A protein has these predicted regions:
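Helix-start (N-cap) detector for alpha-helical repeat units in TPR-like alpha-solenoids
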Residues: 7, 41-42, 75-76, 108-112, ...
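Register position in tetratricopeptide repeats
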Residues: 19, 53, 87, 124, ...
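Conserved structural position within tetratricopeptide repeats
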Residues: 32-35, 65-69, 103-106, 136-140, ...
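Short coil turns that delineate tetratricopeptide repeat
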Residues: 38, 72, 106-109, 143, ...
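Canonical tetratricopeptide repeat
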Residues: 46, 80, 114-117, 151, ...
């Protein structure tokens, strides 16, 4: 039996709220829909979507667990559960559920989604070969699946198989040149191999597509590695403007100031870093070295 026009209208309002990233509004609209029409499952799906968009993953998982008791055969709730098992690194549970869901996959889109998350679970369990087999099976059916290319590239990178990683990541750039993560991954891959110019080019591309403090940090440190200290400082300061709590960016900036013999600036950065991570012995050691240099410079200047 189809939904009446009022229900469809309410669902559309929730979907629009989600499209506008108004997750709390979407949540309350879905909550109202569930209260008025408890048998209409799309209201529950949209509530889960709202909770996930708002980063309330624990609450989403609780709702899914509760509702699957009432609708144990509902495949969409099962797929939500699979996604969250992977998110929470419950890889054994994800594999069991995923294999069950895969047996009854009702369409190609559903099959691809389940296969992808089974691959994530295999990777999480330390079975890279199994993950790659699943992902290559997925690519044989869906040769434009960007998630599969990205994940295979990451797995090969993690296992120091750089040529294979590069091949899959470059294939991903052919499919989607504006993919938000592929240029960052290529930048890290080239950095790991000491190919600094290539790394800088890819990281600059990543920053242009989707700026983030972590990508800026990676670019800043790579600029430092080719001797562009001023460029590195500028980029790292920009990363810290975006996120003052990026601890590694703060440490990197202090290190570069130390290399430049700008000991007071180095000490200032590491003091801030220590407030973020008081037990970090490396930061403490760096602070002591910088403080000694500052005191030495002051002693010399007094004489």
């Amino acid at each position: 039996m189809g939904m009446d026009q009022t229900v469809k209208s309410r669902i559309t309002r929730i979907q629009l709220a989600l499209e506008n990233n108004e997750w709390l509004k979407a949540f309350h609209l879905a909550e109202s829909g569930i209260s008025d029409e408890p048998a209409i499952l799309p209201f529950r799906y949209l509530m889960i979507d709202a909770l996930i968009q708002g980063g309330r993953f624990d609450e989403a998982a609780k709702k899914i667990t509760l509702w699957r008791k009432d609708w144990p055969k509902d495949r969409k709730l099962g797929i939500y559960a699979l996604h969250l098992h992977v998110y929470f690194k419950k890889f054994d549970e994800a594999e069991r559920l995923g294999e069950t869901l895969l047996e009854g996959a009702q369409n190609i889109v559903e099959k691809r989604d389940i296969t992808l998350h089974l691959a994530f679970a295999a990777h999480g369990k330390g079975n890279p070969r199994g993950a790659i087999l699943l992902l290559n099976d997925l690519l044989s059916e869906d040769p434009l699946n960007t998630d599969a290319y990205e994940t295979i590239g990451k797995i090969y990178f993690e296992n120091a198989r750089f040529e294979e990683a590069e091949r899959y990541l470059l294939a991903l750039t052919d499919i989607d040149p504006l993919h938000p993560r592929v240029h960052q991954l290529l930048g890290l891959l080239y950095s790991e191999q000491g190919k600094w110019d290539e790394a800088i080019m890819e990281l600059e591309e990543a920053v242009e597509i989707e700026p983030s403090d972590e990508t800026m940090r990676e670019l800043g440190w790579t600029l430092n590695m080719v001797g562009d200290k001023d460029g590195a400082i500028s980029v790292l300061e920009e990363a810290l403007d975006m996120n003052p709590l990026n601890l590694q960016a703060r440490i990197d900036l202090g290190t570069i100031f130390m290399d430049q013999e700008n000991y007071e600036r180095a000490l200032a950065e590491w003091k801030i870093a220590q407030t973020q991570d008081p037990g970090n012995t490396a930061i403490k050691s760096n602070m002591e070295k910088a403080r000694e240099k500052v005191e030495k410079d002051r002693t010399i200047s007094r004489h």
